[in-house]
Design a protein with these regions (language model features):
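Ser/Thr/Pro/Gly-rich, low-complexity intrinsically disordered stalk/linker tracts of secreted
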Residues: 16-908, 1000, 1007, 1011-1014
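Short proline/glycine-enriched turn/loop motifs at strand-loop junctions of beta-rich domains
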Residues: 532, 741, 930-936
Length: 1014
């Protein structure tokens, strides 16, 4: 790439002339015609004399100026330096010509195919005794490019034999890629990639000789100078030495700067031709660039080193119009070829200040910000522009935040010829799909045939291939400086996919404490290999008995949970997500917070993971989960339905998830069942595939856990036959258990014959289908009681009704307890009912492995009572054989006494104590009694000394009551006959005070008389 416009000026005089340096005329433009016609091309020429077609190859490019004169000689000091800056887009292509070697140039033997143009000038030569204005001509040749100079031309000004010898000048050309303060000071644009040309250290004399003998070095001054570049010069098939700008809206202004030897004077002047570039709307003006993407590997769902090539066809013949320069470029990558989070490993960013775009300062981007390489195929010369691609960061920003802001891509292509192309691109990912659109806007008018950008490959590649195989496409849209646009698509193929994309993940779990019932930390791991379908939903059922004490945690509020801004008081663990394709996914971690109700579940999780790594800070990715409870097994179910697969346009390609539940002060505790357990998970992919996983879970030393449940029961029933028939009997069952014992697995209880099931109520049982659909729709008569369960894992007790539920094929309906608690936690305890010989047996065979502080079952009397009574309960000894089995396997069997309430007051049938036997011996009444609860027994009568006896538990006891004086006297007289009052005061206020009476009388005297008669 190089630009036309070089002004030639011949060496000027060594003697100082009167007056100041001045430019009388300065013109630059592109002209038509042949070599003879172009010599007369000036601003005053008809417009038809100028070539104006945008992106065309002009026949000629010329620059010319005249200096002010005083008499026949120019004014001012001799020129030391001159510079010409031409319009952006006006390009000279040195590759169109052969190269004249420096030795050939010095010997005036440059080949004809190296000629780039000619010069024409008028000079004042101070030949001794014959100073005069001479008309001189010469040729311009293409010289080899040198380091720091992409354009080099030699100007051979022919002398006038035999007096004036030839003059050789070197015209150095360059590209203005950086801002230059000195140009800005005189109003000349810089950094816009226009070409400029300069002659330095202009000689001040020319050799004069006669008959081949050197006579002197004569000063000479240029009066007029014109340089003509042959725009159609070039080797066969490449006759495009000059190319016009593509912008019809920008002025075609060129700038001239002159500088003299001391005393230094400078002159600067712009010039704009009378006609501007036009023809941008020419339908024959070609503009069909393309973009193709080639993968380093075509393996699906893997990191890939992508090579993107933007190809711009060049039309190099003189009778052709060249491709217009690209102003804006948009390339949309194939769907599925997206950003790869693994790239963040060790990645840094290059700031705009470090790129130094528009500056000649060296690029200072960190090595760790390099994400690829770039090559630009231009004419300065081919394959000379190459460099690096960097991840960019906007100045003044603390981090790269992602959408709605684009990701920045910096390109730095350098050449040994001191040309630097520094571009800032933008990558916009689609927020929903991650599809990338890469844009480079306001590109320089720099002719190129190919721009090849290759991103790094390997496990940390910035891009990763699609998960699915098949043909995809790269779409592109380019706009030219002419205003034209062109778009299209090129194919992109991904291969290596199996017939069906697999969905086979692995799961593992660990717990920190092995002992049953111990507080523990629990870690859940889920891993997905490359090539598997992406994870969309996770539903995990924890091992039975692995539960946490929710009252210990402050639940996070809904607003804070949604925002991921919960406090530490709500944290119960940590989570780590490994994201990105390849062998080096990047881990991002964050806290796990316990929340209140979420999406209809009683509890939830808020898991904010801060997506900050390296130069990136995309903010929090907040994942939510529901926490439910299986109503039958009590197992905790954690379900994530909104598992993110993309965030701010970056597909996560989730590889591994690790969640650890741990909390200072203890939260989670182990099951108390040492049998084989498991964590069961159901996975659903984003494509709808499912997978079931199970990982074993076990605890030990269950036998070391104590198991001492306290079971009690009480009943009541009316003694009035009519009332009893109408309302039946009531039953209350209580169970108490200390903390840190083995949890209950099953309970089997048998009611005595005196408390049979009530047939009329059994017949009102709720049908199984109705109960399953909606218990509230069950017949009123099927609701026979209520239950309350207090557990340390919930802040509030579980409460709910007790239903009789009939099952098809079962002989008797079951008793089901429908318990609900905090935030809608529901637990269903099901018992199996069997009735034989009037004895009702209820079996709760599978109670959840959850600690229970207390359990109360109330089966009240009433029209729909579950039980009725046979006989006067207060006069009977009622027991309930009970078998309680622990989760650890320990079995407790007890004959649970059933206390009878409502037996206090006067009259018969008022006892919670039963008299088993009585006798008088040694002046004492010996009573054998049975109590049905702990309490105090009192025995009173005037014939007895009042006696009190305490018993710590229910049972059968012997009480010896001394006779009073009256009693002893009556015994001696054989006239002892009285009714003893036996009272019972229970220890528990829940029990009833009872009284029993027994008649005491003796007939010893009669018996003795009978024996004597015999």
């Amino acid at each position: 790439m190089a630009l036309l416009a070089s002004l030639l000026i011949l060496p000027v005089a060594g003697a100082h002339a009167a007056g100041s340096l001045g430019v009388a005329k300065w013109e630059a433009g592109t002209c038509t015609g042949n070599e003879t016609q172009v010599k007369s091309c000036e601003y005053t020429s008809p417009h038809s004399a100028f070539y104006t077609q945008a992106a065309g190859h002009p026949p000629w490019g010329l620059t010319g100026f005249e200096l002010t004169t005083s008499g026949a000689a120019p004014t001012g000091s001799p020129l030391k330096r001159l510079r010409v800056d031409v319009p952006p887009g006006l390009a000279a292509d040195p590759q169109a010509l052969a190269v004249c070697a420096p030795s050939q140039f010095e010997a005036n033997t440059c080949p004809a195919d190296t000629k780039a143009g000619f010069v024409q000038l008028k000079a004042y030569v101070e030949i001794p005794l014959a100073a005069q204005a001479l008309t001189l001509e010469g040729n311009v040749y293409n010289l080899p490019q040198e380091a720091g100079h992409p354009l080099m031309f030699g100007i051979d000004v022919k002398g006038i034999p035999p007096l004036v010898k030839d003059v050789h000048l070197v015209l150095e050309g360059h590209v203005s890629y950086a801002h230059e303060d000195v140009l800005a000071a005189r109003g000349v644009p810089s950094g816009d990639f226009h070409e400029w040309f300069e002659i330095n250290n202009i000689p001040t004399t020319v050799a004069v000789e006669a008959l081949g003998i050197p006579l002197t070095d004569a000063p000479l001054k240029t009066i007029e100078s014109k340089l003509f570049f042959n725009g159609h010069a070039g080797k066969e098939g490449k006759e495009n030495f000059l190319t016009m700008p593509s912008n019809c809206k920008a002025p075609s202004t060129s700038y001239l700067e002159l500088e003299t030897y001391p005393p230094v004077e400078k002159a600067s002047q712009p010039t704009t031709p009378p006609v501007s570039v036009d023809g941008c709307e020419n339908p024959n003006l070609p503009f069909k660039p393309t973009a193709t993407i080639a993968p380093e590997t075509s393996q699906y769902d893997s990191p890939d080193g992508i090579t993107t090539d933007v190809h711009v066809p060049q039309f190099e013949k003189s009778n052709q119009l060249n491709t217009a320069d690209i102003a804006d470029a948009h390339v949309t990558l194939p769907e599925g070829l997206t950003l790869n989070p693994s790239a963040v490993n060790g990645l840094q960013a290059c700031t705009q200040s470090q790129l130094h775009k528009g500056s000649a300062a060296p690029v200072e981007c960190p090595a760790a910000s390099k994400i690829g390489t770039v090559n630009i195929e231009t004419d300065l010369p081919p394959r000379s522009l190459s460099g690096n691609v960097y991840l960019g960061q906007e100045d003044g920003t603390a981090a790269i935040e992602g959408l709605p802001h684009p990701f920045l891509i910096f390109i730095d292509a350098e050449s040994v010829y001191d040309v630097s192309v520094r571009l800032e691109g933008q990558a916009f990912p689609n927020a929903a799909t991650g599809q990338l659109e890469v844009s480079f806007l306001g590109n320089p008018q720099l002719p190129f045939s190919d721009l090849t950008l290759t991103l790094n490959g390997g496990p940390r590649a910035p891009l990763a291939n699609p998960l699915s195989c098949g043909a995809a496409s790269t779409s592109f849209a380019f706009s030219a400086y002419t205003g034209a646009s062109f778009g299209g698509a090129t194919p992109f193929t991904v291969s290596g996919c199996p017939e069906t994309t697999p969905f086979a993940l692995s799961q593992a779990t660990t717990n920190s404490a092995p002992n049953a019932g111990a507080y523990t930390d629990y870690t859940f791991n889920l891993e997905r290999g490359d090539g598997n379908q992406y994870l969309g939903k996770v539903s995990t059922v924890l091992p039975a008995g692995l539960v946490g004490e929710i009252p210990k945690v402050t639940l996070c509020g809904a607003a804070q949970a949604q925002a991921g801004s919960c406090t530490a008081a709500s944290q119960i663990g940590t989570a780590t997500a490994y994201v990105g394709a390849g062998s080096e996914p990047y881990p991002f971690s964050g806290p796990v917070f316990l929340t209140g109700p979420y999406q209809g579940a009683p509890y939830g999780l808020s898991i904010p993971i801060h997506a900050a790594a390296g130069p990136f800070d995309l903010g929090n990715v907040v994942t939510h989960a529901t926490i439910g409870v299986d109503p039958h097994s009590g197992r905790v179910i954690v379900t994530t339905t909104d598992l993110p697969s993309i965030f701010k346009g970056v597909p996560l390609r989730l590889r591994k998830v690790t969640v650890t539940v741990h909390r200072s002060g203890n939260f989670l505790f182990n099951p108390t069942n040492c049998g084989p357990l498991a964590t069961n998970t159901t996975l659903t992919s984003t494509a709808g595939a499912t997978q079931s996983l199970a990982s074993p879970f076990a605890v030990a030393n269950c036998n070391a856990l104590p198991f001492k449940p306290n079971f009690s029961a009480a009943t009541s029933a009316s003694t009035d036959p009519k009332t009893l028939k109408a309302n039946g009997a009531a039953l209350r069952v209580n169970l108490l258990q200390n903390a840190h014992e083995a949890n209950i697995h099953s309970v089997v209880a048998e009611l005595p014959k005196s408390l049979p099931s009530r047939l009329t109520t059994l017949q009102k049982a709720c049908p199984e289908a109705t109960y399953a659909a909606s218990p509230s729709s069950c017949p009123e008569g099927s609701k026979v009681g209520s239950a309350t369960v207090t557990t340390p894992v919930l802040p509030q007790p579980l409460k709910g009704p007790a239903y009789l539920v009939s099952h098809g094929g079962a002989a008797f309906p079951d008793l089901d307890l429908l318990l609900e608690g905090d935030n809608g936690v529901r637990v269903i305890l099901e018992s199996n009912t069997d009735i034989k010989g009037g004895i009702t047996k209820s079996t709760f065979a599978s109670i959840p492995d959850v600690p229970v502080s207390s359990f109360v079952l109330e089966l009240p009397s009433g029209p729909n009572s579950a039980l009725t009574a046979v006989g006067a309960l207060c006069t009977q000894t009622l027991t309930m054989p009970t078998t309680i089995t622990a989760q650890s396997g320990t079995v407790v069997k007890v004959a649970t006494p059933i206390a009878v309430s409502g037996c206090t007051g006067k009259g018969k049938g008022k006892t919670r104590i039963k008299i088993l036997s009585k006798k008088i011996k040694n002046n004492k009444l010996v009573l054998r009694v049975q109590t049905f609860a702990a309490g105090r027994v009192s025995v009173k009568n005037r014939n007895l000394k009042t006696t009190f006896k305490k018993f710590a538990k229910a049972g059968k006891f012997t009480i010896k009551v001394p006779l009073s004086r009256k009693g002893v006297k009556g015994q001696r007289a054989h006239k002892l006959s009285f009714k003893a009052r036996v009272g019972f005061l229970p220890k528990s206020k829940a029990e009833s005070v009872s009284v029993a009476f027994t008649n005491v009388g003796f007939k010893h005297k009669a018996k003795k008389k009978g024996k004597k008669k015999r």
